[in-house]
A protein has these predicted regions:
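Short, T/G/N/S-enriched strand-turn elements that build extracellular solenoid repeat scaffolds
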Residues: 71-74, 90-98, 224, 233-239, ...
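Right-handed parallel beta-helix
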Residues: 106-107, 144-152, 218-228, 241-252, ...
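Structured C-terminal portions of repeat-based eukaryotic scaffold domains
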Residues: 374-379, 391-398
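Extracellular "leader-to-stem" segments immediately downstream of a signal peptide or signal-anchor
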Residues: 2-7, 11, 20-83, 88-101, ...
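Short glycine/acidic-rich loop motifs that flank beta-strands on beta-rich extracellular proteins
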Residues: 79, 90-93, 113-114, 134-135, ...
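Active-site-proximal loop/turn and secondary-structure-junction residues that shape catalytic pockets
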Residues: 88, 239, 286-288, 320-322, ...
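Alpha-helix capping and helix-loop boundary segments enriched in small/acidic/polar residues
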Residues: 58-61, 257, 261, 265, ...
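Active-site capping/gating regions of soluble enzymes
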Residues: 343-348, 358-360, 373, 389
Length: 463
């Protein structure tokens, strides 16, 4: 209740300030983006270097001990750069610590074992649900001033012989004949209100882990490297702030292979990255159902710019685990182009997850082609249209978007009997090659504005 009251007071203060300044000059949301950008300051580190090969025991087939020991010593001595030199190295999960820049040299290939025996238990969140699970390939909890940099490659080695085996994806047959996998078990634990400390998935039944999971961390820099073959989401900052993800290449087409998913994070910059993924390229999240309401922390002040998206379920998505809300997102100067890219912008939730999504600004997007729609809303995601926690999407702006090929422009799937999405503005957009221009589904949405919009060369006034 106190948190909600504080949010209302902050909103009133913002409104009062805005009203008092109306006579002077209208504040552009893109000027606000500049202010947020100025608050996102990349991490800096002392000029100290620790090379992992100096800590390696030749008896070890894995470099895990060498890497983690170098990280610990570096952190204890005040920080610096832990260098993984040119060459190929095999490791188990790595634990990042404060004031450490884990640096991959230009010709480094860092491979991660797929043997669950080497994966310790850590606190994390899987698809918005809190639990204890086997460690992500790179993990940090409560650390400050951390980085992964360099032009090397990190390979999770996930394929159908390990993380994507039939048993892990489809599940195994239980004694009662029911076929279930570990992720579904976690869903059931959440539905049964089992406390998160009892939602434990050990080595023998661990849920596929994220590649990089940075939990409750501050001042994060991820720059330059390539990620391949992840078991699950690739980059997952969680309950963290002041994050820069720059010039990272994400190439991974496995199940649930989202590219970058900031969850309940504040002040995030994602720029000049390449996405070629098996799920959403970027998906902004803030918890799911009861767990999301317990934390009640939105994702806010997120900037995406100068990125390139190929395959994926969406170029930029918000949700579906967005119970804590999402506000103040800017996406600009991106290119998105693939027959296997489903949607350009996608916002999704349902009546059990809820969440308020507001102040979303998109401009200067070049689309070669996408499989379905330019803008998609799903307020009944997973066909859940009945529940006490209605999502609410509003103040969404699209400007200067061009597309050469899509099935349709809009697919705004709201509730049949209520309005839970409004104030959508589409301006200065050109949509060509629209195969079904008259099948723009708009349900449960009001106050949609079109200005200088053409579809297949014809002026488009509305739906």
């Amino acid at each position: 209740m106190q948190t909600r009251t504080a949010q209302i007071l902050v909103s009133l203060l913002f409104l009062t300030t805005a009203i008092s300044s109306c006579d002077k000059k209208e504040v552009s949301p893109w000027n606000q983006m500049t202010e947020v950008n100025n608050q996102i300051v990349p991490s800096v580190f002392p000029e100290r270097s620790f090379v992992i090969t100096d800590y390696h025991d030749v008896k070890d087939t894995l470099y895990t001990n060498a890497i983690n020991r170098a990280i610990t010593i570096c952190s204890e001595q005040g920080g610096g750069k832990v260098i993984i030199p040119d060459g190929e190295f095999l490791t188990a999960p790595i634990r990042l610590k404060s004031n450490v820049n884990l640096h991959l040299s230009d010709s480094t290939v860092l491979k991660f074992t797929t043997d669950p025996f080497f994966f310790d238990l850590v606190q994390t969140r899987i698809e918005g649900i809190d639990c204890y699970n086997i460690s992500p390939l790179i993990y940090a909890y409560g650390e400050t001033n951390i980085a992964i940099t360099g032009n090397g490659v990190m390979d999770g080695q996930a394929d159908s012989s390990n993380w994507f085996s039939e048993n892990r994806i489809r599940g195994i047959v239980q004694e009662d004949g029911k076929k279930i996998n570990e992720k579904t078990l976690l869903y059931e634990m959440k539905e049964d209100s089992i406390p998160f400390k009892e939602r434990v998935f050990m080595r023998e039944n661990g849920i596929r882990p994220q590649f990089i999971n940075l939990y409750k961390c501050k001042n994060i820099l991820l720059e330059g490297f390539t990620l391949n073959r992840s078991p699950f989401w690739l980059i997952h900052p969680l309950l963290s702030e002041n994050i820069t993800v720059r010039k990272v290449k994400m190439q991974s087409h496995g199940y649930n292979n989202d590219g970058c998913d900031p969850e309940s994070c504040r002040n995030v910059l994602i720029e000049d990255c390449d996405f070629d993924t098996g799920d959403d390229c970027i998906a902004i999240k803030s918890g799911r159902d009861e767990d999301g309401r317990y934390w009640n922390i939105p994702s806010e002040n997120i900037i995406v710019r100068h990125c390139r998206m190929k395959d994926g379920h969406a170029g930029v998505a918000i949700g579906s685990e967005v119970t804590g809300g999402c506000r103040n997102v800017w996406v600009e100067n991106c290119t998105m182009d693939s027959p296997e890219l489903d949607r350009i912008i996608r916002i999704k939730s349902n009546a059990m997850r809820g969440g308020e999504v507001e102040n979303i600004f998109i401009r200067n997007i070049r689309v070669g082609e996408c499989k379905e729609s330019i803008l998609g809303f799903e307020l009944k995601y997973w066909h859940v249209d009945d529940g006490p926690y209605l999502p609410y999407f509003h103040n969404i702006h699209l400007e200067n978007i061009t597309s050469k090929k899509s099935q349709y422009v809009l697919h705004l799937d709201g509730f049949e009997d209520k309005i839970q999405a409004r104030d959508i503005f589409v301006k200065d957009c050109t949509f060509d090659g629209v195969m079904k221009p008259k099948i723009n589904k708009v349900t449960g949405v009001e106050n949609i504005h079109f200005e200088n919009v053409t579809v297949n060369g014809q002026d488009f006034k509305g739906v």
